[in-house]
Curated annotation (Swiss-Prot):
Cellular-component GO terms for this entry: anaphase-promoting complex; centrosome; cytoplasm; mitotic spindle; nucleus
TPR repeat locations: 4-33, 37-62, 70-93, 128-159, 164-187, 198-222, 232-260, 267-294, 299-329, 334-362, 369-397, 402-434, 442-474, 479-508
Assembly mode: V-shaped homodimer. The mammalian APC/C is composed at least of 14 distinct subunits ANAPC1, ANAPC2, CDC27/APC3, ANAPC4, ANAPC5, CDC16/APC6, ANAPC7, CDC23/APC8, ANAPC10, ANAPC11, CDC26/APC12, ANAPC13, ANAPC15 and ANAPC16 that assemble into a complex of at least 19 chains with a combined molecular mass of around 1.2 MDa; APC/C interacts with FZR1 and FBXO5. Interacts with PPP5C and CDC20. Interacts with CDC26. Interacts with FBXO43.
UniProt-listed SUPFAM superfamilies: TPR-like (SSF48452)
Family stated for the protein in its record: Belongs to the APC6/CDC16 family.
A Pfam family annotated for this UniProt entry: ANAPC3
Gene: Cdc16
Region (Disordered): 577-596
GO BP annotations, alphabetical order: anaphase-promoting complex-dependent catabolic process; cell division; protein branched polyubiquitination; protein K11-linked ubiquitination; protein K48-linked ubiquitination
Modification Phosphoserine occurs at: S490, S560
Protein's name according to its UniProt entry: Cell division cycle protein 16 homolog
């Protein structure tokens, strides 16, 4: 009986996804052919596609086909991998080649010339070997051995340069640094294995690799003209905009992709991250619910839900629950680990946040975000040395990221290196301005305030005021910005303006210790300058409508009693250590006081005026 028509019918049913029909006829063909290896292989394929993994593996291994044929060995291992029996799958792949297999292949070669034992199965040896390396990499990934997983993926790609899955696992999971990605691309034998499509492969690989490069118009080689509108190419461009902090352009591109393909797998994480950055809570809510309804077993669905609860605030427990579900579905899903760390960081749970970030750093060696957030947590726990080290690592991966540059400037400020801090802050500001010519996103407000702080330290009071006023444009109701402006006015001797700004700051935040203390000092100094005339105008300025003249004259002693000489010396030492000159003793005669146009000397520690380190907000 000629079995070829039945074999073709089995393939036809497989192509039509009628797996039960294919299984029925594959079983009959295997019996009719007296269990020819090829027919048993296709029977096992049908069993695998109907999720009968142990039956499929038994069909191959009971006949010792996994020891004779690479394709059967690969399929048997894949069955155990699908059943989550990772060690058994690895044992099959790493099985030593038996002597009888080598004799069998020699016999085939002698009998049929140079016939490949797998040629009848329409599979090349290099393709099967590449598939084995790919599967081995996935198993190592599941066993948390990232080093061997990376090596296996590289080998799979070198054996078969068309094996995009291996390339995608290396790049989308950030398993390689930028330098390692470049070395991998240069090591691929494109000339040997794909002379005709060499230009196409080089373009698609390079387009996916350059995520930290400055986004520019995609240059398509003439031989592959027509890829401009390809969604994968557009997503790669959007990713470059995302990593260069141009979130508006990134959102525009990802929205275009989502209109054409609403569930584009590569686009979804970038689109979700952009929605978080632009604070589009309603859109993220709608998208996350749609994803959970349609793809409940996909980690990106629960990642989207977790990001939504993180964004709305005060829902961190809910966020952790859904992000934990995402990491359970795929424990190598780095973005979910980063967001999981954010849910602890916003509650100042630094140890738990860092544990999540360290997990993300192990999974995403080529991504700068885990390093950035680890450094941020170390900075918040006053460990500036370790913070500087991790920021340095983040900067080596993403040298153009203004968030990282800003945090390096914060560390320099905390170390008292004012000039260095100013350089880093200005560099970050230039990078931001290059994105959209002007600073408009409110997340850059801490950078402007920090520029104001460092300019104040360098006695550039006019510039400092300008930066703080720019910060007020972005976030108008920030008490710390008003107190910073008031502080600069007090340093310049403009006590009337200083009092106004400190009052405004206290109106926004009544428990602001710094503003309360400084308001007392400024009122004291202002009255000292105005003793010649205390009238309704002065009382109005000081918001002291119920005070009589005697109270106004003695307000200094009520607010801050005179210090004795010994106390003054101690305070002077503290302020000098903080980089500030002390306030002159208020009992001195007015003529002995320095010119108010010079530095205003304040008798208090400036530690209450905290530098803002929150520009790197907890985004994806």
């Amino acid at each position: 009986m000629n079995l070829e028509p039945l074999r073709k019918r089995v393939r036809q049913y497989l192509d039509q996804q009628q797996y039960q029909s294919a299984l029925f006829w594959a079983d009959k063909v295997a019996s009719l052919s007296h269990e020819e290896p090829q027919d048993v292989y296709w029977l096992a394929q049908c069993l695998y596609l109907t999720a009968q993994y142990h039956r499929a593996a038994h069909a191959l291994r009971s006949r010792k086909l996994d020891k004779l044929y690479e394709a059967c060995r690969y399929l048997a291992a894949r069955c155990h991998y699908a059943a989550k029996e990772h060690q058994q799958a690895l044992d099959i792949l790493d099985m030593e080649e038996p002597i009888n297999r080598r004799l069998f292949e020699k016999y085939l070669k002698d009998d049929n010339g140079s016939r490949d034992p797998s040629s009848d199965w329409e599979m090349s040896q290099s393709s099967i070997k590449s598939s084995i390396c790919l599967l081995r990499g996935k198993i190592y990934d599941a066993l948390d051995n990232r080093t061997l997983a990376t090596y296996s993926y590289k080998e799979a790609l070198k054996l078969d340069v068309y094996c995009f899955e291996a390339f995608d696992l290396l790049t989308s999971h950030h398993m390689l640094t930028a330098q390692e990605e470049k070395e991998l691309l240069d090591s691929l034998p494109l000339n040997k294995l794909c002379a005709e499509e060499q230009e196409l492969l080089r373009f698609v690989f390079e387009n996916k690799l350059k995520k930290y490069n400055k986004p520019s118009e995609t240059v398509i080689p003439e031989s592959v003209d027509g890829l401009q509108e390809n969604l994968d190419v557009v997503v790669s461009l959007a990713e470059r905009h995302y990593y260069n902090c141009d979130f508006k352009m990134c959102y525009k591109l990802t929205s275009t992709v989502m209109e054409k393909d609403p569930f584009h797998a590569n686009c979804l994480p970038v689109h979700i991250g952009t929605l978080v950055e632009l604070n589009k809570a309603n859109e993220l809510f709608y998208l996350s619910h749609k994803l959970v309804d349609l793809y409940p077993s996909n980690p990106v669905s629960w990642f989207a839900v977790g990001c939504y609860y993180l964004m709305v605030g005060h829902k961190n427990e809910h966020a952790r629950r859904y992000l934990s579900k995402a990491t359970t579905l795929e424990k190598t899903y780095g973005p979910a680990w980063i967001a999981y760390g954010h849910s602890f960081a916003v509650e100042s749970e630094h140890d738990q946040a860092m544990a999540a970030y360290f997990t993300a750093a192990q999974l995403m060696k080529g991504c700068h975000l885990p390093m950035l957030y680890i450094g941020l947590e170390y900075g918040l726990t006053n460990n500036s040395k370790l913070a500087e080290r991790f920021f340095g690592q983040a900067l080596s991966i993403a040298p153009e990221d203004p968030f990282v540059i800003h945090e390096v400037g914060v560390v320099a400020f905390q170390n008292g290196e004012w000039k260095t801090a100013e350089k880093w802050f200005l560099d970050a500001l230039e990078k931001i301005k290059a994105i959209g010519n002007e600073v408009t996103v409110d997340k850059w407000e801490p950078l402007l305030n920090n520029l104001g702080h460092v300019c104040r330290k360098l006695k550039k009071y006019a510039e400092a005021l300008d930066y703080h006023r720019q910060a007020l444009v972005l976030i108008p109701q920030n008490a710390s910005t008003y107190s910073a402006i008031g502080y600069i006015h007090s340093l310049m001797g403009n006590f009337e303006n200083a009092v106004d700004y400190f009052h405004t700051a206290l109106g926004l935040r009544r428990d602001d210790t710094f503003s309360v203390t400084m308001l007392g000092h400024c009122i004291e100094m202002y009255i000292g300058d105005s003793e010649a005339y205390i009238g309704a105008d002065i009382k109005d300025k000081l918001k002291c409508y119920d005070f009589d003249v005697h109270t106004m004259k003695t307000l200094k002693n009520i607010i801050s009693p005179p210090w004795d000489f010994r106390d003054f010396e101690v305070e002077k030492q503290n302020t000098e250590e903080a980089g500030l000159a002390p306030l002159q003793n208020s009992t001195k005669a007015p003529e002995s006081r320095p010119n108010l146009e010079e530095t205003f000397e304040i008798e208090m520690n400036e530690s209450d005026m905290m530098l803002e380190t929150s520009m790197s907000d907890h985004s994806t």
